[in-house]
Regions:
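PRPP-associated nucleotide enzymes
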Residues: 1-248
Length: 248
C-alpha cells in the first residue's frame, strides 16, 4: 500500500489543534501552512465520515495566550474550545528573545519561564482535550539526566510532571540522552535525529568544506553527546560513497 494511502486509511484520533506558544509562533505558522496545504490537496473517500469532521480547515491553530499580572505571576488562556481535540502544543524553551515587564524592568524569559507557561496552557485545557502532545525542539533540562552527586533529576521530574498532567506524547529533537524515556516508559517519547539537516546545510553553506581525514575532525563537547559525531561521520561517509558511485 502506498504511503499516502496508508495514512488515509487511518481515522484521526481527534480534531487536530496546534497551540504554538509565543516562543514558537513563527514555527507554528509554518507548520500550520504546511498542514493546510497538504490536507487540501489530499483526496480520500472518507470525507463525509463523521470522524473526519473538521479535517480540512483554513487553519489548525488554537489561539492561546500567557499574560502576566503586575506581580509577575502568569496564567494560561485558551481562547478557542478544544473539547475532543488532538492538541499539539509547541514550545521553545531556549527562546530568550521573549520579554516581559516586572516592576518596571524588562526581563528575558528563561527556560523555567517557558516551561511554566507550557504547564499553564495544559492546565487551561482542563482535561477537555482528547489527547495532549508536546513538541519541543530542545528537551527542557535534558542535560540534567543523571546524578553525579547530591543532585536533582530535573529531566525525569519534568517528564513525569507533564505525563501526570495528561500529556500522552513528547516529541523533541536530538535529545541529550534519549534513555531518559525510562522515567516514563508507558508514555510516548520521540527524539527525532537531525543528522541529515545538519549535514545538508553544512554542505550548502560552507563552500570550502572538505570531508576527508586530512581536513575534517568532528568533536563532541561532552561525553553525553558522543553519539552525534559518530552519526555525522557515518552519514558523511555514506554520502561521499553515494556521490562517488554517481560520478563514476
Amino acid at each position: 500500500m502506498p504511503r499516502d494511502e496508508r495514512h488515509t486509511a487511518t481515522i484521526p484520533y481527534g480534531t487536530l489543534g496546534i497551540v504554538p506558544l509565543k516562543s514558537c509562533s513563527k514555527m507554528g505558522e509554518k507548520v500550520d501552512d504546511y498542514l493546510v496545504q497538504w490536507r487540501e490537496q489530499r483526496e480520500h473517500e472518507n470525507q463525509s465520515n463523521l470522524a473526519f469532521s473538521g479535517y480540512k480547515r483554513d487553519s489548525y491553530v488554537v489561539s492561546a495566550s500567557t499574560p502576566r499580572f503586575g506581580s509577575g505571576e502568569g496564567k494560561g488562556v485558551l481562547n478557542d474550545s478544544i473539547r475532543g481535540y488532538d492538541l499539539y502544543i509547541m514550545v521553545d524553551v531556549c527562546n530568550y528573545s521573549i520579554e516581559y515587564s516586572l516592576c518596571g524592568t524588562t526581563n528575558h524569559m528563561s527556560p523555567d519561564d517557558h516551561y511554566a507557561d507550557l504547564k499553564r496552557v495544559i492546565a487551561a485545557a482542563g482535561g477537555k482535550a482528547r489527547r495532549i502532545n508536546v513538541i519541543r525542539p530542545f528537551l527542557y533540562e535534558s542535560r540534567q539526566h543523571k546524578r553525579s552527586g547530591r543532585e536533582s533529576l530535573d529531566c525525569a521530574l519534568m517528564l513525569q510532571e507533564l505525563t501526570a498532567m495528561g500529556v500522552e506524547n513528547i516529541i523533541t529533537f536530538d535529545a541529550h540522552d534519549p534513555r531518559v524515556h525510562n522515567s516514563i516508559p508507558l508514555k510516548g517519547f520521540e527524539s527525532v535525529s537531525c543528522t541529515y539537516q545538519f549535514i545538508k546545510y553544512l554542505l550548502l553553506g560552507v563552500d570550502d568544506l572538505h570531508i576527508d581525514s586530512e581536513h575534517m575532525m568532528v568533536i563532541s563537547p561532552d561525553e553525553g553527546g558522543m553519539g552525534a559525531p559518530n552519526r555525522y561521520f557515518h552519514f558523511c561517509f555514506r554520502l561521499i560513497s553515494s556521490l562517488s558511485q554517481i560520478i563514476l
